[in-house]
Structures are given as structure tokens and as C-alpha cells.
């Protein structure tokens, strides 16, 4: 069963069970500056889980594009991904444990055809705060799960909370038995031996935690998440997500192009290219800050591993074409934004190639200087960064491949001192946003909104504001543009809007 079939089955199944199908939120959160990317299906729905009414009702389902960046360095093994898709269904004060579990069991066994004996589940074991979740366990037994396939764990494994305080509750997780040999007589889902693979998690938000402890919520919610890539891999009997149709065409092409064989490098190139394309398609652009730096890091790590495979970097355009052709049915925006994706990624490649060559050469010189130690100083890492623009994470990866450690603590101290020195020298010049508030700066601030609107008309929706700085002396407006722009047309649009004399309202 292909990934798109699994996705469609999921959405259709929950639609039949009264759920409204809602669109995936963008990878770049629109109104949540606390996170770089959308990391889970529930993230865009937090206001509704807290009680706000959703326009589509109390039963929702969707597929959500997600990016998680904490495991970038692990990509290259047989399971880690930066970009992934999460299938989810939610009850906002509607059904609860019994119906949620019954639907999950039905979908797994009837829609996907997974044999009952292949499934194991875990439930909350209970503690001094909250009781053992017998309701969930009994619901699984009623559905058809074998009693000796039900396990109980504590808060570390079967409890969910968003932060220190807030809505929380027990969860129940579903595991697929791969058929691999048990690691011991006590082998169970909590093992990390690979026999059991988690496939779905249903969170039951029935409590609220504050400084006084736990209290029952008036509105009980259900939040579930099923990883599409992992489920596709298991249903196809594959060992890794890279063996499925989601990656097969790009992996095959990389194998044809490579002059040095490395399955790890092929996986890194394939995964980081897909992730970068998804981020760019949703409006992300490389930079030295926040999500822009994550994107830059993904593209540059991909390029370094193309070099390791001795693949001509001019092939990058072809690799993008292969990915678009393979994924366009699942993600039509990739085809729509193909030229923008190419432009952004290829431009970043050109910027990095010289840095990579110089940085690797200087790194090797520093390694050759070491005699009785296998540790590279933080000073060297900082020198490569400060003098040659060589990213510290690339130095770290090179050192690891060469059997060396690096003193990251020393590097971080030097980097922090460098930041403080730079900040002190440019605090006034580069202060962001509205630095002062009077008639002049308010006029400039209004002008930024007019300019932003005009740019979107001239350039298109791919014109994204990246910052602004407003003082009584000047206005600075930062934005990115994927092609040459027409200054004259932008000014005409701004002046036309100004001439309308639209009344302005000050919101304080």
C-alpha cells in the first residue's frame, strides 16, 4: 500500500465517522513565534484544544506537514527524518477514550489489514496524581486486543503535557510487531531493540495541571498522531523509509551518480533535499537566523554529502526535478513552486561551494597539526567559522568522521563573546522594529505596511517580510525576493494607496 493510499484511507475513514477534513497548516507557523516550524498535528489546533470553538466543529481530521530539527545530525541512519507527515484526528469535547480506541482499532485492522496479533498497546500505569487507566485498557480488550499484548507504563512513557502547566492527560500508544527476534524473555514495547515499532498515539486530555496540582478539565479532548512514513515502511515490509516509494526514485538516481558508495550519505542527501524543498515551498528562505539557519544547514549538509559521494553538484537541478515528479501527487505545491525551489536551493549551493572547499582544506591543515591528542580546540572551530564562514556543525561532523572530538564548550564561549562584542557595537544601528513612537515613526510604520502590500502585488506572495527598523531618521524594511523587481511599479502602487486617504486606526 502506497503512502498516498494510506493518507486517503485515513481521511476518508474519519470523514465517514463524522470528522471534518481540514487542510494542513503551513510548515512555518503563522501566529506562533515560539517555534521555528510546525512540529506536530496538534500544534495549529492548540487554541481549540483550550476551548475556543473551531469553525468546522468538534470532530476534525487532517494530514499535517511537520519538521523537527532536534535529530538533524542523526539523519543518515535507518529511521530518522527531518520532514515527515503526521495523520491526526481530534475530538474537541466530543467523543473520548472508548470511541477513540474503537476507531483506531478498526482503522488498523479493517482499513489497513494489520493482523490483531501484530498489535500491542500501552496504557498509563497510574500514580499518586492520577489513577491507572483501566478505561483505556478495557476499551482495547473490548475492541479485540489480546490481554497479554497490553502493557502499563508511567508518566515518562504514557503521559502528555504541553509545558510545565496546562492541559494534560494519559495516552495510549499502539505498536507493530516487526517479527524480529525478542531481545530477551522480558522483551516488550518499551525495549529499543527494534522488535516493536510505535505507530500511533492517542492522547486523552482530561486534566489541567497548575501549581496546586491536577484538576479535571470541563472539556475533555482527544489528540492523535500517526506517522505516515513509518506506517508506509511497515505495511510495505521495508527496513527503512528510504526503501519506500517516497524516496526510491531519488535513492536510485543517487546510486547511479555516485563515484564513492555510502548509504549514509545517500540517505542524508535524499532526506535533506526533500525537507529543504518542503520548507522552501512553504515560504522558508536560507539565512543566518532561526528557521532560515535550519534551512541553510540542511542544504549545506546535503551539498557536503553530495561531495562525499563525488556527485557533480550540477546534478542538483535534476535531483529536484525527480523529487517534484515523484511527490507532486501528494504535494501539488511542489510542482507549482518548482522554479522558486530550484532558484533558492541552487543559489545557496553557489554560496556554499567555495566556503566548503576552503573550510575542508583549512580543517585538514589543523588536523595535521595535532600530534598527541584527538581533540580539536574550540579556538580552531571558531577560527574556521569566523575567518572562513565554515559552519561549526560541519566542523563537528568532519571531526567525528576523522575520529576526533572538538571542544564545543570553548567554541560556544568564544562565539558568545563575539556576539556580545558585535551587539554592543551595533545596538542602535540595527535595533529592529519600531524603536521610538511619534508622528514621524508612526508614518514610517504605516509605510512599511503599504510597502509590504505593494511588494506582494508586484512580486507575488513569495515576497516575505524578514524584518524592519524604524527611527526618526530612517526606515529600513527587510524582505526577500526570488527575482528582479520593478522599483517604479512598487512606488506607483504605494502612492496610489496613499492617495486614497484611507482612515487609519491606532490600536494600543
Segments (PLM) and residue ranges:
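A glycine- and charged-residue-rich anion-binding loop/surface
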Residues: 1-490
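The Walker A/P-loop phosphate-binding site
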Residues: 488-508
